[in-house]
Each structure stands twice: as structure tokens, then as C-alpha cells.
Amino acid sequence: MPKARVFLAWSGPRSKAVATALRKWLPHVIQTIEPWMSENDIEKGARWLTEISGQLQNVKMGIICLTPENLLEPWINFEAGALSKINDSIVCTYLHGLETTDVSDPLAQFHGTKADKEDTKRLIHTLNSRLEGESLETTRLDEAFEKWWKDLETDLSNAKGTHAQEPPKR
């Protein structure tokens, strides 16, 4: 059975660090998930826009990694819009260094997930519920989450220092 692909959207150094952390961590918690991230999953020499567009058309789950630095980036809005047009897709904003009140439309339309333990666990349960026959039982999912959470927490903490630009002014 093919793995369920999750598109990880990012823009900027900190957002990239968050997406990289999720890409590494997600398959440890839900083994039937295959995260897709442009930085790692587009072959050298490939037409990157064609590859990204193809992925955006074929995935059912996407995580948009938002930080104070990339809230107003057009690329984030493009990817979120493309993901949301797919029938039965789920688009989750993952807020690193942000509160839900910091996010404005159109991204505010998606129920945001704070990059903390409680909210990340809820996100994992949501992703698991979308796996159509491949989902883990709740007890097993919770055990995997608890086992691997510290790794993600460390990587998210390290990502806090990964921003090379000032946040955009509103």
C-alpha cells in the first residue's frame, strides 16, 4: 500500500528548519506517512515548479509552516491556496513563534496548530484520522508521539534561532 503523502510548505530559513524537523519526525510517529518537502524531494535538474505543482495536485494533506518572518510571503499563500482547492484535502497551518491571532486571511481560514506538545498531538491525531484504513489505533499513536516528541521539540527549539530577516511590518 502506498504511503500517504503530506506536503510540507515553507518559505524562509526558520520555516524551512521547522519543515525539515517535521519531515524527519512525522514518519517515526505515523509510519504510513511520507512527508514531501521541495528542498529534499526534488531531484537536481528537475523543473522545480512543475514538481511542486504536481505534488500540490496529488496530495490530500498539507502542513504550512508559518513563522513571524513568512506570514506575508506570497509563496506560502500560493501553496495554501493550491492545497485547499483539492477535494477532501486538509490544510494545517503550523505556527512557530506565532499565536493564532497573529495569522490573517487567507491563512486564518485554516484552523491553526501551535508548535507545542498539546496542539501538535492534536494535529497528529487529525492526520492519522485521514489515513483511510492505514491509521494507527489511538493507544499506539499516543505511545509513538510520546516516544518521539522530545526529538521534535529539540529541533523546533533550535529553529527559533534560524531567521535571517526581520519580520514583515503590517
Spans of features found by a protein language model:
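Short beta-alpha junction loops
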Residues: 41, 68-69, 94-100
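Short, well-ordered beta-strand core segments
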Residues: 62-63, 112
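Generic structural "secondary-structure junction" signal
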Residues: 44, 73, 78-80, 105, ...
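Arginine/glycine-rich "motif VI" loop of SF2 helicases in the C-terminal RecA-like domain
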Residues: 28, 81-91, 96, 102-103
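Conserved beta-strand scaffold positions in the cores of enzyme catalytic domains, especially
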Residues: 35, 90-92, 112-114
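Conserved TIR/SEFIR loop-to-helix hotspot centered on a Trp-containing motif
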Residues: 2, 68-86
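Conserved N-terminal substructure of TIR/SEFIR domains
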Residues: 1-62, 84-89, 170
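C-terminal interaction surface of TIR/SEFIR-family domains
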Residues: 1-27, 97-170
